[in-house]
């Protein structure tokens, strides 16, 4: 069983929701990144590790800034895989990266490396559902979950995608990029309600979730909460503030 499936089953039995925490690999520096990753990993249920890219179209200002800084650290994909192998324990890890990085390594080799080094899932935000077949086939071959991103723009399209989704369905809480500072779009509640009619795959929500209040609103309808930009901001403020934030979110999930 994929570790993501196992984790969501465990949480369901306990009546808990998944804390899915994101950070950018290589941030804030090449030397410090593993310490921060281990710290975040100790609080979350699922770790989402972003691999930096020069044109991250789905990412907002905060994660773009983290990616730019990480790229200056001369971060390589091999560094990411070796680090996962080094620190991973009993909780799942998802890699978030852009398609060009996968193509550069080769689709077959990339997903075999995911299996061999311990990545449980992959999120590729610039590949549409219609373009994902080759990636999903490689995932199945290696026991890795391909996580579908679903937006609030079309409920019927979202339902079509969710019917075949694996691991968890990543539901975007609003139109736009990560870290958006506005209010959560209320149509996310309708979307989640409709998706539950067509899939038993866990539903996770993300993009712009930044506070305990946001989490409390969404945890009643979602199976998991994804937080990224807010974690990056707390890294900038220092480990004490980061730990306080992680503890706060952990306490309400």
Curated annotation (Swiss-Prot):
Q: Which InterPro entries does the record cross-reference, listed alphabetically?
A: Aldolase_TIM, RibuloseP-bd_barrel, Trp_synthase_alpha_AS, Trp_synthase_suA
Which reactions are catalysed by this chain?
A: (1S,2R)-1-C-(indol-3-yl)glycerol 3-phosphate + L-serine = D-glyceraldehyde 3-phosphate + L-tryptophan + H2O
Q: Known SUPFAM superfamilies for this protein?
A: Ribulose-phoshate binding barrel (SSF51366)
UniProt pathway annotation: Amino-acid biosynthesis; L-tryptophan biosynthesis; L-tryptophan from chorismate: step 5/5
- Provide one Gene Ontology cellular component: cytosol
Where does the record place the catalytic residues?
48, 59
* Pfam families found in the cross-reference section: Trp_syntA
A Gene Ontology molecular function term for this protein is:
tryptophan synthase activity
Gene3D superfamilies named among the record's database cross-references: Aldolase class I
User: Into which EC class is this enzyme placed?
Assistant: lyase
Query: EC no.?
Result: 4.2.1.20
Its signal peptide is none
Assembly and interaction partners: Tetramer of two alpha and two beta chains.
Q: Which family does it belong to?
A: Belongs to the TrpA family.
Q: Which NCBIfam families match?
A: trpA
Q: What is this protein called?
A: Tryptophan synthase alpha chain
Q: Which organism is it from?
A: Caldicellulosiruptor saccharolyticus (strain ATCC 43494 / DSM 8903 / Tp8T 6331)
Give the taxonomic lineage as stored in the record. Answer: Bacteria, Bacillati, Bacillota, Bacillota incertae sedis, Caldicellulosiruptorales
